């Protein structure tokens, strides 16, 4: 099928590689070029187009573009992926709350966190679990990504049981089994098995558990292309987390993205990057915090 779709096609993989970079900034490495062409063929096949017809249709069809992006992007993430970063954000939130309490000020400002490139939402839900576990209530976590398919999963908040194993026991209270919509399932004996966590899971269901409803009011998932000038929100953030995403961009694009992220950060707030990322960055309004485990910058002026 791929050979048929590629027949009489004047485009090669480099055309598609440049197209992806132009649209969303991602510079795909050589090892992902076969994945890229598989995504192109998959998208063309789904719409009964040749690869060349797909190319010609993309400029005027935003839905088709989004489907191609969804097929190309690999949403790699997991719960509690980098615990030192999560702990840092939680401690900062607690510090702000205690300072307001000690001074007697009525600081009811919402504690806002933005997770950039949140994929299917695990980092956002992780942050929500960590803040809620400290009895904090006035916080909002924004998750953004360029993959609408990944965001749909994030909003659903349902994951397979293997991912639950990465959540520390202290936070398991923020998870619960997925309830079946089929009221007859128990009557007809729908196949179930008991996992290592002692909870029965429907083997026919791809989603075995979900985040607790009490967390949903604190999170919001929005489509956003960080490569563009558009802002996902007008609210300044106390913390912005952007980890393991900048590596997909060229250095000069990384610099532009970091500048836009710092503009969205409130004075006194923090920008948390992955260890080793953006070591070339020297902004005048941010200072790097000395920390043994995380790569964090504090905004010191507007």
Q: Which ranges hold each PLM region?
A:
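Conserved beta-strand signature within the Rossmann-like core of class I S-adenosyl-L-methionine
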Residues: 267-275
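Conserved AdoMet
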Residues: 2-114
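Conserved SAM-binding loop of SAM-dependent methyltransferases across substrates and taxa
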Residues: 120-135
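A short glycine-rich, Lys/Arg-flanked "PGG" loop and its adjoining helix->strand segment in the class I
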Residues: 255-267
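Conserved class I S-adenosyl-L-methionine
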Residues: 108-121, 142
